[in-house]
Amino acid sequence: MPRLLPISAATLALAQLTYGWGNLGHETVAYIAQSFVASSTESFCQNILGDDSTSYLANVATWADTYKYTDAGEFSKPYHFIDAQDNPPQSCGVDYDRDCGSAGCSISAIQNYTNILLESPNGSEALNALKFVVHIIGDIHQPLHDENLEAGGNGIDVTYDGETTNLHHIWDTNMPEEAAGGYSLSVAKTYADLLTERIKTGTYSSKKDSWTDGIDIKDPVSTSMIWAADANTYVCSTVLDDGLAYINSTDLSGEYYDKSQPVFEELIAKAGYRLAAWLDLIASQPS
C-alpha cells in the first residue's frame, strides 16, 4: 500500500524517546491478557517463549522497547506508533495509507508478525514475532502512539508533580505509575488484577463484548486500525482537549490527572482484553 508521508528525521529522532506504556503499562497489559487467554493459547505462547511461569507474557512485554535500541533492532523503531496527521483538539482521526510511514508503523507490524505466527508458529522467527505482538498491541492503545503532533507529544514540554517532562512521558509512565502505586513487576500484577476484576464483574463488564467488535484474524490491518482509531479519539477528547496553552502552563498532576485516570485505565484494560482475544485467534488457526 502507498506510504504518502515518510517519517522525517526530526520526527524519528523524537519518536525514539517513546516507550509505549512504559514497563508498568506493558506488563499490566500482558498480565490482563494472561487472565483471559484460553488454556490452549497459554500453552501455545509458553511453548514459543520457552517460559511456563505465571508471568510468561509479562516477562517479554517490554522486550521490544529494549530491542529497538540495538543495532539488530533499529529497524523496528517505527513499529511502535502510527503518525496520525490530524488536527487535535479540533479533529482526530487515523488513516492507514496516509499515516503509516514508508518504514512501516504499528499497524503494518501487527500484520507482519501476526502472519509469521499464523504461518510458522514453530519457525525461528516466531519468538520475536510473539514478543512484538504482545508489545505493539499495548502501544496501539496509548493515544499518543496514534498521533503525529510534536512526535506524539514528545515535543510538548509539561510539568508533572513539579518536575519538567513531556506530554508523551506522563501518559506512558507518570500517570499509570501514580495510579498503580509503583512500577515493579509485582505492582503490575496487582494493577492487572484490579483491572481484570473490572472487566469480569465491575465497571467494564458491560462494555467488554464491544471491545472485540470487528476483530478479524484474516485482516490484521483493519482490526488494529479499529483499535488505533479508538485510542486516537482520546487525543481530542482528553489528552489535548483543553488546548496547548493549558497543557504548557498547568501542573498536570492535579485536575488533568484526575480526568485522565479513567481513560488510561480503561485503555490498558482494553489492550489486555484485545491482546488475549488476538492471541486466541492466532493459536486456534491451523498452521
Swiss-Prot record:
Disulfide bonds join C92-C236, C100-C105. A divalent metal cation 2 binds at H145, H168, D172. One of its GO terms (molecular function) is endonuclease activity. The record marks D65, K68 as: Important for catalytic activity. Glycans are attached at N112, N122, N248. Coiled coil: none annotated. Its EC number is 3.1.30.1. SUPFAM superfamilies: Phospholipase C/P1 nuclease (SSF48537). Binds 3 divalent metal cations. A divalent metal cation 1 binds at D65, H80, H135, D139. The keyword DNA repair does not apply. Its cofactor is Zn(2+). Residues 135-183 are annotated as: Substrate binding. Inhibited by inorganic phosphate (Pi). Belongs to the nuclease type I family. This is Nuclease S1. The lineage of its organism: Eukaryota, Fungi, Dikarya, Ascomycota, Pezizomycotina.
